[in-house]
Design a protein with these regions (language model features):
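Short loop/turn and low-complexity linker motifs enriched in small/turn-promoting residues
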Residues: 17-175
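Hydrophobic h-region of N-terminal signal peptides that target proteins for export
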Residues: 8-16
Length: 175
């Protein structure tokens, strides 16, 4: 009994330490407590013409391999600030200045099914006049049992195909 008590007292400081969240570990994400309200609506093809002197990024959330409900709401971070969110199979676009940028995709809330990654990151170097597609792919399969997210660049043809099938995401910060 004394041995167990001594072990518990010695181990207590380890359990009391603050764990860094996934979003704190990448320079792309914003504060972990930021939340968005998201609406999606089926629309036509997105405008894919960048503003003068800018690049255009189209962020796509793909839940086609997420076999559970509810689907995650995915926040998008750029260079340390949250800039928007998606839910379900949806997308939105934003302009960036030329140069190096860091992207983050992070689930707004924890997903109960499994303990996979809930944040993913990527970086790219934007050139003026160029359109970039990125896909946040959310996955969960009953036989694997772990939910996961990945963030990868997409070929422009695949990006246009997905945005023609998916809904446009609109969002605003929750208060």
């Amino acid at each position: 009994m004394k041995r167990a008590l001594v072990f518990f007292l010695l181990a207590l400081p380890v359990f009391a330490q603050n764990k860094l969240t996934d979003t704190a570990l990448t320079p792309a994400c914003g504060p972990d407590d930021a939340k968005f309200a998201v609406k999606t609506a089926k629309s036509g093809r997105p405008a894919i013409q960048p503003d003068e002197g800018k690049a255009l990024v189209i962020f796509v959330e793909d839940d086609s391999e997420f076999a559970s409900h509810p689907k995650p709401t995915t926040r998008t971070g750029l260079d340390g600030n949250w800039i928007g969110a998606t839910h379900g199979n949806s997308y939105f676009s934003f302009s960036v200045d030329p140069g190096e940028h860091h992207l983050c995709a992070s689930w707004q809330t924890s997903i109960i099914v499994g303990q996979g990654h809930k944040t993913a990151a990527a970086h790219f170097t934007a050139e003026a006049g160029t359109v970039y597609y990125f896909r946040a792919k959310n996955t969960w399969a009953r036989d694997v049992g772990t939910a996961d997210i990945s963030l990868k660049p997409l070929d422009s043809d695949e990006g246009q195909l997905l945005t023609s099938k998916f809904s446009l995401s609109t969002f605003h910060p929750k208060k």
